[in-house]
């Protein structure tokens, strides 16, 4: 299973989540619309991992997307990969702070991974959308980081703290419901 991510260190988190969700739901696919797992936000059963662990591609040159490789091996074994909009994970957008050459090498991993798996194909090239977004996000990321630093905000810490407050509030709003879960 996999789902969208929210970039906790970028502004407009809601818009970013919606955009990420759209890209992953509609283009992050292979072999007739089979879901590709996203490494920062994926879960697989132990039995599925044991079935493919001896077959996943070793990548000593570090030129492939390991999560897509895992996805394609799972599909080879007939496992179903699913996408859940509710399975949201927070990650950093620091990749947007790299040079274009570094970003390009990272995007080449899509092509390299599928080249290593000639039995698989994709209708959409997700990296094309990411290339289109890169200049804007690359420009925005350091500006937003300066804003956060000037206000002494650690976005990951803030999200964690906000989640803790929500948990406490839900306990006091519905103490019997929380106690039933514990």
Specify the residue positions occupied by each region the protein language model found:
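Terminal low-complexity segments of carbohydrate-biosynthetic enzymes
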Residues: 112-182
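Conserved nucleotide-sugar donor-binding
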Residues: 37-53
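A residue-level structural signature of the nucleotidyltransferase/glycosyltransferase Rossmann-like core
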Residues: 41, 63, 81-82
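Acidic donor-binding loop at a coil-to-helix junction in glycosyltransferase catalytic cores
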Residues: 60-70
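Hydrophobic residues within well-ordered alpha-helices
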Residues: 73-75
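Active-site donor/metal-binding and catalytic loop motifs
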Residues: 84-101
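Short, flexible, basic/aromatic active-site loop/helix in glycosyltransferases
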Residues: 2-7, 13-35
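A structural signal for short, well-ordered beta-strand segments and their strand-loop junctions
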Residues: 1-2, 82-84
